[in-house]
Regions:
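A short hydrophobic beta-strand segment most commonly corresponding to one strand
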Residues: 98-104, 110-126
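Short acidic, Pro/Gly- and aromatic-enriched capping/linker segments at domain boundaries
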Residues: 1-12
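Histidine-centered active-site/metal-ligand motif
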Residues: 65-67, 109
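A generic structural motif
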Residues: 11-13, 84, 112-114
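Short acidic-glycine-tyrosine-enriched beta hairpin
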Residues: 25-27, 86-104
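A short beta-strand-loop-beta hairpin characteristic of the jelly-roll/cupin
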Residues: 67, 73-94
């Protein structure tokens, strides 16, 4: 059995802004833990330890554009955020969504809380 896990990559555009890209991680059947049935697994390359973030963005009325501090995976755990890239495109992300933030240069992107606070995410540098 095989499959894929979809994720959104946010990368710097050639015009100096940011843009969304839809991508997938291939999944294959493996025996991850002895005693449990086989499951679909995939690899997410990470460079170092993960960072857990919990934030109540309700006090930020007008979020400013910002860059990703480094290339990183963002695993949404709780809450719903909206990310806007330079061309005005917006996407919402919630629990279970996977984002690859790569726009370390240029204008960056805007992140807004659209659900109830707080939101929680796990950041994996890589």
């Amino acid at each position: 059995m095989t499959g894929t896990k979809s994720f959104t990559r946010i990368a710097a555009s050639t015009a100096g802004g940011s843009a969304f890209h839809d991508e997938e991680i291939p999944l294959d059947t493996s025996l991850a833990i002895t005693g449990l049935p086989s499951m679909l697994t995939g690899t997410i390359p990470a460079a170092s330890a993960a960072v857990y973030v919990r934030h109540d963005m309700s006090g930020a009325p007008h979020p400013a554009p910002h860059n990703a501090p480094r290339r990183q995976w963002v695993v949404m755990l709780r809450g719903i955020i909206e990310v806007e890239v330079t061309d005005g495109s917006r996407r919402t992300f919630g629990p279970g969504d996977l984002i690859r933030a790569e726009d370390t240069d240029g204008t960056g992107h805007v992140t807004r809380l659209v659900g109830d606070p707080p939101w929680e995410a796990l950041y994996l540098p890589g």
